[in-house]
A protein has these predicted regions:
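Actinobacteria-biased recognition of intrinsically disordered, low-complexity terminal regions
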Residues: 1-4, 11
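A short glycine-rich, His/Asp/Glu-containing loop-to-beta-strand
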Residues: 8-42, 47, 96
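Short, charged/polar surface micro-motifs in flexible loops or helix N-caps
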Residues: 26-27, 35-38, 57-59, 66, ...
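Glycine- and acidic-residue-biased ligand/ion/polar-headgroup-sensing regions
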Residues: 46-58, 63
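Short acidic-glycine-tyrosine-enriched beta hairpin
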Residues: 50, 64-82
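Ligand-binding loop in jelly-roll beta-barrel domains
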Residues: 79-104
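Acidic/histidine-enriched, glycine/proline-rich intrinsically disordered or flexible terminal extensions
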Residues: 104-130
Length: 130
C-alpha cells in the first residue's frame, strides 16, 4: 500500500510536533517552477516528488482529498500516491524531482500529440489515472 502525502505547513502554522520528511534514492534535482501540473490524477510508481511554495499557493488533489498550501509550506508525495496540483494566482515554488521525473516532464513538454501521454508515463514508471 502506498504511503501518504506529507503536508508540512509554513513555519507560522506549525505546531510543536514535526514530521520526518525523507526520500529514497541517490539523486534529485530542485527547480524553481511556475504553473500547474497535469490536470489528471497520476501516480509515479517508483519516484517521490516534493514541492516547497515560495510565493502564493498550490492546490493539491489526491484520491480522497484536496488541500491548499501557502507560501512556506512543503508537500512531499511518496511513490505510489495518486496526485495532481494546480498553481494558484502568483504562485512560485520549488519542485524536487528524481532524474526520471525530470526526463518525464521534458518528454511530455516536447510531445506534439497529447494522445501519446499514457505511453510516455508508462516508460517512466508512472501512470495517468483519469
Amino acid at each position: 500500500m502506498p504511503g501518504q502525502p506529507i503536508i508540512a505547513p509554513s513555519q507560522a502554522e506549525r505546531a510543536d510536533q514535526s514530521q520526518r520528511m525523507a526520500a529514497d534514492g541517490d539523486s534529485f534535482a530542485i527547480h524553481e517552477w511556475k504553473g500547474s501540473g497535469p490536470p489528471q490524477l497520476h501516480v509515479h510508481h517508483e519516484d517521490d516528488e516534493a514541492w516547497h511554495v515560495l510565493e502564493g499557493g498550490l492546490r493539491f488533489r489526491f484520491a480522497d482529498q484536496t488541500i491548499d498550501v501557502n507560501a512556506g509550506s512543503t508537500v512531499f508525495v511518496p511513490a505510489g500516491v495518486a496526485h495532481t496540483y494546480v498553481s494558484l494566482p502568483d504562485a512560485r515554488y520549488l519542485v524536487v524531482l528524481t532524474p526520471r521525473l525530470r526526463e518525464l516532464i521534458a518528454e511530455l513538454s516536447s510531445a506534439a500529440d497529447r494522445a501519446g501521454d499514457d505511453e510516455i508515463y508508462r516508460r517512466y514508471r508512472s501512470e495517468l489515472l483519469e
